[in-house]
Protein backbone atom coordinates (compact mmCIF):
# COMPACT_ATOMS: atom_id res chain seq x y z
CA UNK A 1 0.00 0.00 0.00
CA UNK A 2 1.24 3.49 -0.84
CA UNK A 3 2.36 5.98 1.76
CA UNK A 4 -0.07 8.88 1.89
CA UNK A 5 0.33 12.41 3.20
CA UNK A 6 -2.63 14.78 3.35
CA UNK A 7 -1.78 18.48 3.10
CA UNK A 8 -3.78 21.69 3.50
CA UNK A 9 -2.70 25.29 3.01
CA UNK A 10 -4.15 28.44 4.48
CA UNK A 11 -3.55 31.58 2.44
CA UNK A 12 -3.82 35.34 2.54
CA UNK A 13 -4.25 37.89 -0.20
CA UNK A 14 -1.17 39.75 -1.35
CA UNK A 15 -0.83 43.24 0.05
CA UNK A 16 -1.50 46.66 -1.41
CA UNK A 17 2.08 47.81 -1.00
CA UNK A 18 3.37 44.78 -2.88
CA UNK A 19 0.90 44.07 -5.64
CA UNK A 20 1.04 40.31 -5.96
CA UNK A 21 -0.96 40.44 -9.16
CA UNK A 22 2.04 42.09 -10.83
CA UNK A 23 4.05 38.91 -10.33
CA UNK A 24 1.08 36.60 -10.86
CA UNK A 25 0.63 35.69 -7.20
CA UNK A 26 -2.72 36.89 -5.84
CA UNK A 27 -2.48 34.63 -2.76
CA UNK A 28 0.33 33.54 -0.46
CA UNK A 29 0.64 30.62 1.92
CA UNK A 30 0.57 31.48 5.62
CA UNK A 31 0.16 27.98 7.08
CA UNK A 32 0.98 24.42 6.04
CA UNK A 33 -0.75 21.56 7.82
CA UNK A 34 -0.27 17.88 7.00
CA UNK A 35 -0.92 14.42 8.39
CA UNK A 36 0.74 11.12 7.50
CA UNK A 37 -1.30 7.93 7.13
CA UNK A 38 -0.11 4.42 7.94
CA UNK A 39 -0.86 1.26 5.96
CA UNK A 40 -4.36 1.12 7.50
CA UNK A 41 -4.98 4.78 6.61
CA UNK A 42 -4.85 5.69 10.28
CA UNK A 43 -3.21 8.98 11.18
CA UNK A 44 0.37 8.26 12.19
CA UNK A 45 1.99 11.70 12.29
CA UNK A 46 1.36 15.39 11.83
CA UNK A 47 3.15 18.51 10.65
CA UNK A 48 2.34 22.19 10.98
CA UNK A 49 4.20 25.41 10.33
CA UNK A 50 3.18 28.99 9.85
CA UNK A 51 4.69 30.72 6.83
CA UNK A 52 5.79 34.35 6.60
CA UNK A 53 4.43 35.86 3.36
CA UNK A 54 6.69 37.92 1.13
CA UNK A 55 3.96 40.10 -0.42
CA UNK A 56 0.81 39.54 1.61
CA UNK A 57 -0.47 40.42 5.05
CA UNK A 58 -3.07 39.14 7.51
CA UNK A 59 -6.26 41.12 6.94
CA UNK A 60 -9.04 41.25 9.52
CA UNK A 61 -11.08 38.90 7.32
CA UNK A 62 -8.29 36.30 7.12
CA UNK A 63 -7.68 36.58 10.86
CA UNK A 64 -11.36 35.99 11.61
CA UNK A 65 -11.58 33.07 9.17
CA UNK A 66 -8.35 31.24 10.08
CA UNK A 67 -7.50 32.50 13.55
CA UNK A 68 -3.99 33.27 12.26
CA UNK A 69 -2.58 36.59 13.44
CA UNK A 70 0.33 38.77 12.45
CA UNK A 71 2.11 37.59 15.58
CA UNK A 72 1.87 33.96 14.41
CA UNK A 73 3.76 34.69 11.20
CA UNK A 74 6.12 37.34 12.57
CA UNK A 75 9.03 34.94 13.09
CA UNK A 76 7.78 32.15 10.85
CA UNK A 77 9.95 30.79 8.01
CA UNK A 78 9.35 31.99 4.48
CA UNK A 79 8.00 29.57 1.90
CA UNK A 80 11.31 28.01 0.84
CA UNK A 81 12.37 27.16 4.38
CA UNK A 82 8.86 26.00 5.30
CA UNK A 83 8.81 23.60 2.34
CA UNK A 84 12.28 22.34 3.27
CA UNK A 85 11.00 21.54 6.76
CA UNK A 86 8.00 19.79 5.25
CA UNK A 87 10.13 17.73 2.86
CA UNK A 88 12.43 16.64 5.70
CA UNK A 89 9.37 15.52 7.71
CA UNK A 90 8.15 13.17 4.97
CA UNK A 91 8.76 9.53 5.96
CA UNK A 92 10.09 8.44 2.56
CA UNK A 93 10.38 9.70 -1.00
CA UNK A 94 7.69 7.20 -2.09
CA UNK A 95 4.72 9.37 -1.15
CA UNK A 96 1.32 10.04 -2.69
CA UNK A 97 0.09 13.50 -1.78
CA UNK A 98 -3.57 14.20 -1.06
CA UNK A 99 -5.40 17.50 -0.66
CA UNK A 100 -9.06 18.41 -0.63
CA UNK A 101 -8.64 19.99 -4.07
CA UNK A 102 -5.89 20.77 -6.56
CA UNK A 103 -5.90 24.36 -5.29
CA UNK A 104 -3.20 23.49 -2.75
CA UNK A 105 -1.01 21.81 -5.36
CA UNK A 106 -1.41 24.73 -7.76
CA UNK A 107 -0.58 27.23 -5.00
CA UNK A 108 2.67 25.45 -4.12
CA UNK A 109 3.70 25.26 -7.76
CA UNK A 110 2.90 28.92 -8.38
CA UNK A 111 4.71 30.17 -5.29
CA UNK A 112 7.76 28.10 -6.10
CA UNK A 113 7.79 29.52 -9.63
CA UNK A 114 7.33 33.15 -8.61
CA UNK A 115 9.81 32.94 -5.71
CA UNK A 116 12.34 30.87 -7.70
CA UNK A 117 12.27 28.01 -5.18
CA UNK A 118 14.00 24.80 -6.22
CA UNK A 119 13.78 21.73 -4.00
CA UNK A 120 14.99 18.19 -4.66
CA UNK A 121 12.12 15.72 -4.79
CA UNK A 122 9.34 18.28 -5.11
CA UNK A 123 8.75 17.60 -8.80
CA UNK A 124 8.27 13.89 -8.10
CA UNK A 125 5.95 14.72 -5.21
CA UNK A 126 3.68 16.72 -7.50
CA UNK A 127 3.16 13.86 -9.95
CA UNK A 128 1.17 11.54 -7.71
CA UNK A 129 -1.24 14.10 -6.31
CA UNK A 130 -4.77 12.96 -5.37
CA UNK A 131 -7.71 15.38 -5.55
CA UNK A 132 -9.97 14.16 -2.73
CA UNK A 133 -12.77 16.54 -3.72
CA UNK A 134 -12.92 15.05 -7.21
CA UNK A 135 -12.81 11.51 -5.84
CA UNK A 136 -15.67 12.33 -3.47
CA UNK A 137 -17.83 13.73 -6.29
CA UNK A 138 -17.15 10.63 -8.40
CA UNK A 139 -18.18 8.39 -5.51
CA UNK A 140 -21.50 10.24 -5.27
CA UNK A 141 -21.87 10.26 -9.07
CA UNK A 142 -22.36 14.00 -8.77
CA UNK A 143 -20.60 16.68 -10.80
CA UNK A 144 -20.94 19.24 -8.03
CA UNK A 145 -17.75 20.33 -6.25
CA UNK A 146 -18.57 20.11 -2.54
CA UNK A 147 -16.68 22.00 0.12
CA UNK A 148 -14.99 19.95 2.82
CA UNK A 149 -17.50 20.78 5.55
CA UNK A 150 -20.49 19.70 3.45
CA UNK A 151 -18.67 16.57 2.26
CA UNK A 152 -18.05 15.48 5.85
CA UNK A 153 -21.73 15.98 6.71
CA UNK A 154 -22.78 13.91 3.69
CA UNK A 155 -20.28 11.19 4.59
CA UNK A 156 -21.58 11.18 8.17
CA UNK A 157 -18.16 12.03 9.59
CA UNK A 158 -18.14 14.41 12.60
CA UNK A 159 -15.96 17.46 11.95
CA UNK A 160 -12.98 17.60 14.29
CA UNK A 161 -11.78 21.06 15.36
CA UNK A 162 -12.36 24.37 13.59
CA UNK A 163 -12.47 24.83 9.83
CA UNK A 164 -9.79 26.87 8.02
CA UNK A 165 -6.94 25.62 10.15
CA UNK A 166 -4.36 23.85 8.00
CA UNK A 167 -3.74 20.93 10.35
CA UNK A 168 -7.43 20.50 11.21
CA UNK A 169 -8.50 20.52 7.56
CA UNK A 170 -5.77 18.03 6.66
CA UNK A 171 -6.93 15.77 9.52
CA UNK A 172 -10.58 15.87 8.42
CA UNK A 173 -9.65 15.32 4.78
CA UNK A 174 -7.73 12.23 5.90
CA UNK A 175 -10.82 10.88 7.68
CA UNK A 176 -12.87 11.32 4.53
CA UNK A 177 -10.16 9.80 2.32
CA UNK A 178 -10.06 6.72 4.56
CA UNK A 179 -13.81 6.23 4.19
CA UNK A 180 -13.61 6.70 0.42
CA UNK A 181 -10.98 3.99 0.14
CA UNK A 182 -12.03 1.48 2.82
CA UNK A 183 -15.84 1.65 2.90
CA UNK A 184 -17.00 -0.16 -0.26
CA UNK A 185 -20.65 0.80 0.28
CA UNK A 186 -19.72 4.36 1.26
CA UNK A 187 -22.66 4.83 3.60
CA UNK A 188 -23.87 8.43 3.58
CA UNK A 189 -25.91 10.59 5.92
CA UNK A 190 -29.50 9.32 6.11
CA UNK A 191 -31.01 12.78 5.70
CA UNK A 192 -28.90 13.46 2.63
CA UNK A 193 -29.81 10.06 1.17
CA UNK A 194 -33.52 10.75 1.67
CA UNK A 195 -33.14 14.14 0.00
CA UNK A 196 -32.08 12.32 -3.17
CA UNK A 197 -35.14 10.07 -3.27
CA UNK A 198 -37.83 10.87 -5.89
CA UNK A 199 -40.46 13.20 -4.52
CA UNK A 200 -44.21 12.59 -4.73
CA UNK A 201 -45.76 14.27 -7.81
CA UNK A 202 -46.63 17.84 -6.91
CA UNK A 203 -50.13 19.21 -7.30
CA UNK A 204 -49.94 21.21 -10.48
CA UNK A 205 -53.43 22.68 -10.82
CA UNK A 206 -53.93 26.35 -10.08
CA UNK A 207 -56.71 28.25 -8.38
CA UNK A 208 -57.96 29.24 -11.84
CA UNK A 209 -58.14 25.57 -12.85
CA UNK A 210 -60.13 24.80 -9.74
CA UNK A 211 -62.59 27.64 -10.32
CA UNK A 212 -62.90 26.69 -13.98
CA UNK A 213 -63.77 23.15 -12.95
CA UNK A 214 -66.33 24.45 -10.51
CA UNK A 215 -67.85 26.50 -13.34
CA UNK A 216 -68.15 23.43 -15.55
CA UNK A 217 -69.82 21.55 -12.71
CA UNK A 218 -72.25 24.41 -12.16
CA UNK A 219 -73.13 24.53 -15.87
CA UNK A 220 -73.75 20.78 -15.86
CA UNK A 221 -76.01 21.07 -12.83
CA UNK A 222 -78.02 23.85 -14.45
CA UNK A 223 -78.36 21.79 -17.65
CA UNK A 224 -79.62 18.77 -15.73
CA UNK A 225 -82.10 20.96 -13.88
CA UNK A 226 -83.39 22.39 -17.17
CA UNK A 227 -83.76 18.89 -18.63
CA UNK A 228 -85.83 17.79 -15.65
CA UNK A 229 -88.04 20.84 -16.05
Question: What do the PLM-derived regions correspond to, one by one?
Answer:
Residues 111-115, 154, 179-183:
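Active-site catalytic microenvironments for nucleophilic, acid-base chemistry
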Residues 175-229:
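Acidic two-metal-ion nuclease catalytic site recognized across multiple nuclease folds
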Residues 165-178:
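Acidic, divalent-metal-coordinating active-site segment for phosphoryl/phosphodiester hydrolysis
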Residues 117-139:
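Histidine/lysine/aspartate-rich catalytic loop segments that bind and position anionic ligands
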Residues 11-13, 134, 172:
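Short, glycine/acidic-enriched loop or turn micro-motifs at the edges of active sites
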Amino acid sequence: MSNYVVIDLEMCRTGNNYTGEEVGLPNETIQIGAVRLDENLEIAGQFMTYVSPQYGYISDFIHRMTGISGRDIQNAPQMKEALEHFMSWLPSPDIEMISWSYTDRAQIEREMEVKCIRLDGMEELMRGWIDCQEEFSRKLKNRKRFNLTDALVIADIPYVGEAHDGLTDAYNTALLFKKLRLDPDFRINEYYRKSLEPKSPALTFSLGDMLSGMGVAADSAQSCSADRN
